[in-house]
Amino acid sequence: MKIAIVLLAIVGLAASASITDKKVKIADKDFLAKQKFLFEIVYRVEDPLMFEEWIKMGKSFTFDKADYNHFDMYMDKFYEAYKYGAILPKGEFFYYAKNWEVFQRNVAFARMHCNEGMFVYALTLAVIHRDDFHGLILPSIYEIFPQYFFNSKFVYEAEKFDYDVWSKYIMYEKEYKDILYKDYATFYKNHDNHYYYFFTKDFKTYQWWKMMGLGEHWYSEDRFMLRDNMDKYNKDSKYLEIFEGTKMFFMPVDYTRDIEFFNKESALSYFTEDVGFNAYWYYLNMDYAFFLDGKTYGLNKDRRGEYWLYNVRQLLSRYYMERLSHGFGEIPAFSFIDSIEYGYNPQLVYHNGVGFSYRKNYYEVESFGKFDYFYKVLDFFNRMDEIITKGVYVTYDGKTIDLRKPESIEYIGSIMQGNVDTLHSYFFKYWYMFAHMYLAYDNTQTLQVFPHIFLNYETSMRDPMFYMFYKKIASVYFQFFNYVKPYTHEELLFPGVTIKDVKVSELVTYFDLVDFDVTNLMNDKMTFVDGQFVWDKTLLARQMRLNHKPFDFDFVIESDKAQKVVIRTYLGPKYDEFGRVISLTENRENFMELDSFLYTLKSGVNEFKRYSKDFYWTVEDRTTYTELYKYVMLALQGKYDFPLDISEPHCGFPDRLVLPHGWYKGMPMQFFFYVTPFTTEYEQFSTYDYSYSCGLGSGVRYIDETCFGYPFDREIDEYEFFVPNMYFKDVKIFHQDTFEKYFEHKYEKFGHFDYNYHH
């Protein structure tokens, strides 16, 4: 990790924050040139660099201390290691470079000589955290490293894709299908008006392509990329222009299946392996990387420890609701002694061909891994229990922390993340890393490590054991607040404000199809014309994913005067897996915050709407790698105004996942709405443009200064809790089967993709 810090350091730092206006900013030529460089430098990052301009730049690398705003011993050691060939093959240094020229040169050098995983890690951190890089973006992590998000079968097919071979294959495939699918319905039994075809009789959920008669190989995409907001792009003349002459190919992609052992948990693989869901966790840990100190990077202004731990709670709440949709119930408790009933096979492959390790059913945690780590992690939880119970902690430098104050959750959060702002950096800083290494049966003393999902942020949430272990982490959060006095009636009451009613529109989830850009997996020859790269082919992974129809709230709030207020919205379960009502005291741990927004009430009755698309922390589908690169090139030619908000901010949670799967007949859930006074001196998003920036280190990311999860952060006294400015609303979440029609009616174009699947 020290290498990553150094690589981050050598790539650059500038310390001035900028204030943006609310108008859409258009990139200038200088910005576009920088953006072009970033897109090209990570193109096929596992292959040798093929752009001559950047190769020459990388070869011009020099190591001069004057080029950096801050220079430390790790940077010096890195260069010494490089001279003697002792660095990881390819990977590490970027944040403290004085200017773009130094940064660019160092990045080109690192791309050629450093480990590709370390390179992308450090480059991502630099782009996210440098103040002078606001607006610059990298492709999404699942576009840079698709193999961390899609199964090995798909990855192998993408890596061996060859257009000439594909063209011949498709010719024979067509002749084959013309015979195979001719009058196919007459050969199979029509029973109760349902069509059960040979190619769909072994259909499993989410294997949509079998219902259309497709195979798991490449198909030409002659229309458009599939996604939520595709209509916006398909009607854009500039969009159609940039894709003229570009060949697109898609392949159906499955989620993890039971291959070697039965495992009911794989029924949730569509959720735990969701690309956007896993990317969210990755970027959270990039935004608040454990080794970045809060003072230098301004992260302490964002309550980084509390925010990280609250996100753990949010993700667990969301996962629990998805489990309830399938009748699974509580997340199993993690134990270092008892065996883990359900195993997991990620079916992923590293870029060098080595497969990711898997865990069998009834896995015994204590029987594997390095026992030094085992005892360190056990000791850590014992110490946390001790200091929280005691209520006072004295740091190694003599500072006393009162753990009965609610704001002390910031310290607890930093300890649980193991970041460098911890109270006792020597003991607490490494426990989190040791825990992941132990669960991945890794060893710091070995030079070669087998890939394991617990060793990468972008893969760890795929495993059901992740939620079991992080439930143990979240238990420390709740243990801390168990010692904080519950809110009193007076503290919760907002005099003069009453929520009279909230109407919720119909809540409907469904599965749709989406294309992910996986062009980085291609191995064919790159095309250059006059030294300029021509992006003429794009590979797409077409996958089914959970989504929901847009919904809205109709608020009716009465106020005795005009005033600014904060309105919070939470979603939580109503019943457990056995149909029993969950008491509010227990259920507070299961509510997930969906939205909080500022609103100015007038005196009297206020009626207004809030739409799901406006939730403050969610994002729509991001613009793809191919599209971004082509837009940049068009803008450099002066034919397009490149807006800085062309893609969604990296830190947003996928909008389509805010609702759990639900049931066909309606799954009972409940919304909780809460209105509080707006008393914060600052205005949210006031120092940055939230349409493209995450505002890290700004101190104004959040709507106010109350504890995250308020008022569900503390234990609930039901005699004190209920006030007129709160409102509970019982709802049902319905699930519609988008693909049911394929069983109900004959599909006339069997063997061809159905673009009307969602109608």
UniProtKB/Swiss-Prot annotation:
Keyword Aminoacyl-tRNA synthetase tagged: no
Subcellular location(s) of the protein: Secreted, Extracellular space
Signal peptide: 1-15
Keyword flag Secreted: yes
Pfam families named among the record's database cross-references: Hemocyanin_C, Hemocyanin_M, Hemocyanin_N
One GO cellular component term: extracellular region
Tissue specificity of this protein: Fat body.
Superkingdom, natural source: Eukaryota
UniProt KW keywords: Secreted, Signal, Storage protein
Sample GO molecular function, one term: nutrient reservoir activity
Membership in a protein family: Belongs to the hemocyanin family.
SUBUNIT field: Heterohexamer.
Function: Arylphorin is a larval storage protein (LSP) which may serve as a storage protein used primarily as a source of aromatic amino acids for protein synthesis during metamorphosis. It is a constituent of the sclerotizing system of the cuticle, and serves as a carrier for ecdysteroid hormone.
Name listed for the protein in its UniProt record: Arylphorin subunit C223
